[in-house]
Amino acid sequence: MAFHGGDIETAAEQTGRTQWLDFSANISPLGVPGSVKQAIVQAAEHLSHYPDPYQRKLRRALAETHRVLPEQIVCGNGGADIIFRTLRCLRPHRALLPVPCFSEYEEALTEAGCRVIRWYLPEPFQITRSVCEALENGCYDCLVLCNPNNPTGSVIEPELLESILETAKQKQMFVLMDECFYDMTEDLEEQNSCIRKIDAFPNLLVVRSLTKRYAIPGLRLGYGICGDVRRIEHIRTTGQPWPVNTLAAEAACAVLNDKAYQMQFREFLQQARPDLQRGLTQLGFQVWDSHANFLFFRAKGMSHLDLDLQEFGILLRHCDTYPGLNADYYRAAVRLPEENAKLLSGLKSCLSAGACGGAQCLKGEV
C-alpha cells in the first residue's frame, strides 16, 4: 500500500499522542457541511435497502453540474477507486508517468500489469513540452497526469495541455487526467478543465473527487467522466456492483447544491493560502505557487522536520516517498488562520533550536 498523509491512527500508535493538528491531509478545515449531515440523517431511513447500483440520482446531479450526459459518468468509492477500476479494465501495456505525482497512479498501473516508465521532471517539477516529445518518440498506450499536480500544486498551461491531448489522440493513447484538486479555487477556469474536452478526445477520462473540498474523506466519493460511453459502461461493470453506498450518494447530491459552503471555502482559501505562503517564505523556505488547498515547499538540509513538528502535535507531509523528490521537500495543507499560525510557530521553534541539523534559515518574524 502506498504511503499517504492523514494517517493519524499510525501517528498515535507511534507516539502515544491522540490529539493532532493535521497538515498532512489536504482536507477542508471548515468541516463537514451541514447539508451533508442533514442528508445523512434523512438517508439513514433507507439503509434497509440496497443502494442504487447505477447511482442514477447522483449521476444526474453530476451531469447537471458539469454539463455532460449522465451516461458519460461513472461513480466510485473515491477518486482512487475510479483510477484503479479504469486501469484494471483498460489493461495498458506501457504507460508514461511524469513524476513527482500521486503514488496511487503507479500502484494502479502496476496492479493492471502495465510497465510504468517514470518521466522525472526537474525542479521546479513543471510539465513542459518535453512530455509531448516523449510521447511522440516513445511507444506508450497510456499517459497519466494530474492537474493541479499533487504534491506541487502546479498546473499545466492550457495551450500545452491541448498539445499533449492532441499528441496522445494521434498516437491512439489513453489519457487519465486526475482533476481532484481542480475545483479548489477561482483562479482555474472551468472552461479550461479537461471535462470540457471529453467529446473532442474520447481517449480521455477525467477523475474528480468530492472528498477534500467538502471534508468527507470518510464517506469516499469520486467519479470519472469520459466521452466514450462504452468505456464508461465497461468501467462501471468492473468491480463490485455497489461501489457507492446510500449515505455517500445522498451526501454528494447535497453538497453539489450547497452554494453557500462552496463560496465560504473559496473565500477562506483565497485569504489563507497566500498568508501561509508568505509565512513559510519569511521563515526561509522555498515555497511553490499553488492552485490547490496545500503548499509545497523545500526545507534544504532539514530531513526530519516532520518528526520535529510531532513534538508540537503537528503532522506534516514529508514528500520523500514521492518518486523524484528527496528528503528536503514537504507539503502542508492550508488550514484555518489560527491553525496555520501554530504551524508557523512550530516551524520557527524547530529552526531556532537547530532541531533540523542546525540549519540557519530563519529570516524574520511571523
Show where each model-derived region lies.
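PLP-dependent aminotransferase class I/II
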Residues: 32-33, 54, 203-288
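Short beta-strands and strand-loop turn motifs
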Residues: 22, 118-119, 142-149, 175-179, ...
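N-terminal "arm"/small-domain region of PLP-dependent enzymes with the aminotransferase-like
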Residues: 1-49, 139
